[in-house]
């Protein structure tokens, strides 16, 4: 089974606007984050399951609502799994998360301190971690770099999760994009904590960085804690699979060690949903 653990939906001008839309245009020259639902569905042909992320980051202009994601994944429950997103600054944030999980059928929480403008060690953030822990759902983090100008990198370092993982040892969490450019920092934190994982989404366009991160993961014996993801629409499933399988090309003829084929295929075929505890259907949950 192939699981894409990191995909986005959302329409430019409706869900993605303002500052982040301007920065997308500056960086890519086009509204890259514009994903009609039918395009997302077609893009997931190459995988067996896919996680679809809501995104509640109004401070940078992104609001992909929980309701929108829940209604979409409910159309394809055999394949799609929806994750909620809640800005910790919102009044009643923990209640909003509980509603998204217990009433809408969403299965996890997406948070991004640099886009939601919060300190990962703040009391508001800890209240969300406590709610996720009580609900028994995983959290996916964006802890790494960004093209968005109004996204404070002071909150981006993976090392900030060390204390959180220690305080919540039963809370399953993973960090997107291998925490790049701080991949080694993330890997040593993942090594410490049984409940912490990573995904390699959006790194295949940077093959040297991906190779170095995977080599470090092999050396620290945590390659089995890396999930496959694309970060669609920023990359495609097909390009991510091809880039991962060809990662050793970047060091051909150098004498550097190859990433073993079994490591690469292990990432692609990782039992991600089982490791996160979300392989089974959510009992009693329904979109609302």
Ranges and model annotations:
Residues 6, 69, 73, 82, ...:
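Conserved, mostly hydrophobic/aromatic
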Residues 32-40, 64-70, 93-96, 158-160, ...:
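Alpha-helical scaffolding within the catalytic cores
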Residues 2, 50, 80-82, 139, ...:
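Hydrophobic/aromatic residues located in beta-strands of well-ordered beta-sheets
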Residues 1-8, 13-45, 49, 220-227, ...:
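Mid-to-C-terminal alpha-helical segments outside catalytic/metal-binding sites
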């Amino acid at each position: 089974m192939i699981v894409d653990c990191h995909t986005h939906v959302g329409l430019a001008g409706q869900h993605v606007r303002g500052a982040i839309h301007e920065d997308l245009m500056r960086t890519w020259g086009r509204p890259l984050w514009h994903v009609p639902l039918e395009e997302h569905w077609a893009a997931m042909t190459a995988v067996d399951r896919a996680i679809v992320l809501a995104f509640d980051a109004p401070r940078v202009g992104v609001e992909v609502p929980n309701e929108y994601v829940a209604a979409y994944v409910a159309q394809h429950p055999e394949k799609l799994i929806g994750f909620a997103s809640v800005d910790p600054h919102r009044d009643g944030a923990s209640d909003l998360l509980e509603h998204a999980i217990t009433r809408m059928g969403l299965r996890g929480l997406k948070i991004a301190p640099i886009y939601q403008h919060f300190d990962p060690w703040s009391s508001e953030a800890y209240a969300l971690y406590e709610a996720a822990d009580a609900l028994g759902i995983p959290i996916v983090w964006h802890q790494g770099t960004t093209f968005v100008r109004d996204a404070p990198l002071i909150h981006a370092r993976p090392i900030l999760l060390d204390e959180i993982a220690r305080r919540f040892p039963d809370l399953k969490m993973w960090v997107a994009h291998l925490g790049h450019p701080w991949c080694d920092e993330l890997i040593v934190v993942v090594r410490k904590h049984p409940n912490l994982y990573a995904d390699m989404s959006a790194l295949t366009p940077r093959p040297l960085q991906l190779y170095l991160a995977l080599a470090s993961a092999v050396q620290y014996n945590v390659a089995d804690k890396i999930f496959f993801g694309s970060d669609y629409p920023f990359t495609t499933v097909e390009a991510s699979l091809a880039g991962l399988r060809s990662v050793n090309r970047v060091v051909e003829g150098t004498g550097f060690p190859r990433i073993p084929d079994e490591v690469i295929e292990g990432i692609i075929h990782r039992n991600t949903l089982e490791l996160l505890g979300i392989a089974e259907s959510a009992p009693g949950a329904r979109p609302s």
